[in-house]
Amino acid sequence: MIRHIYKIMIAIVCCLLAIPTEAQTKAEKNGWRLGMQSYSFHLFPLTEALDKTQELGLKYIEIYPGHKLGGKWGDKVFDFNLDAQTQKEIKELAASKGIKIVGTGVYVAEKSSDWEKMFKFAKAMDLEFITCEPALSDWDLVEKLSKQYNIKISVHNHPQPSEYWKPENLLKAISGRSHLLGSCSDVGHWRREGLNQIDCLKQLKGRIISLHFKDIAPKKAGENEQHDVIWGTGILDVKGMLSSLHGSAGAITALQNSVAHYYQRASSADYLGV
């Protein structure tokens, strides 16, 4: 029962390695790794989020900036202000559960000088990518640091007024720049902005580093936002999106914003066999 409860909160990170569960075996056929976005468990401290990730048999996690650590670290949060000893201990804790911290996000720099701090932190934590939304004026600096530290920049597409709400804007910003720079494709936000998510994925082919992969409910009268639902129960073409991603070495993350609402649902991960 616990397995089904937490699988529906899953954030799927798909890259190159396999993970030994039925759904993960399906994903392996596509060359994907499966993992967790820690915001799926934002009601719990990171120590518990790691426990739940381990219970699912997942080996990878992306941690959102500000996630409270819990345990002996109490109210300390996951960000570039963590001292070196705590960074080491968090890596060791994750490793002890067979989990690698592959990324952090969504990060938005308060000032340009913070980018160096974030890249140093990401390097110390052995992260593969930073999910973020850089200011347009910061791109030269971000590209330079990305090359210097060999860490990918995965740009998220929050809705307007975000600069990157549609693929054309991101592609313009990174045109002619390093392929260490690319997209964290949030398919739900595209649909909320009236965009066709499959067309968006096609536009970004070759530039997708990670995805926040989800399905969303139809918009109801009086609602400000279409909430996330289990894959295949909403209005997005989940099978079509997964089919369009065959052969991609990007990362897929299904981001759910509550726990209790989905206790009775089947796992979204079953769709990875598409």
Language-model segments: residues:
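Active-site acidic/histidine proton-transfer and metal-coordination neighborhood
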Residues: 87, 93-182, 191-194, 203
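The substrate-binding groove and active-site-proximal loops of carbohydrate-active enzymes
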Residues: 38-40, 76-81, 105, 128-129, ...
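Histidine-acidic metal/acid-base catalytic patches
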Residues: 23-38, 42-60, 96, 112, ...
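Bacterial Sec-dependent N-terminal signal peptides
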Residues: 1-27
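Acidic/histidine-rich, surface-exposed loop or edge segments in extracytoplasmic proteins
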Residues: 33, 69-74, 98-100, 123
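Active-site-proximal loop/turn and secondary-structure-junction residues that shape catalytic pockets
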Residues: 40, 65-67, 107-110, 136-138, ...
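Short beta-strand segments at enzyme active-site cores
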Residues: 61-64, 101-105, 131-132, 253-256
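Glycine-rich, proline-tolerant flexible connector loops at the mouths of alpha/beta enzymes
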Residues: 63-89
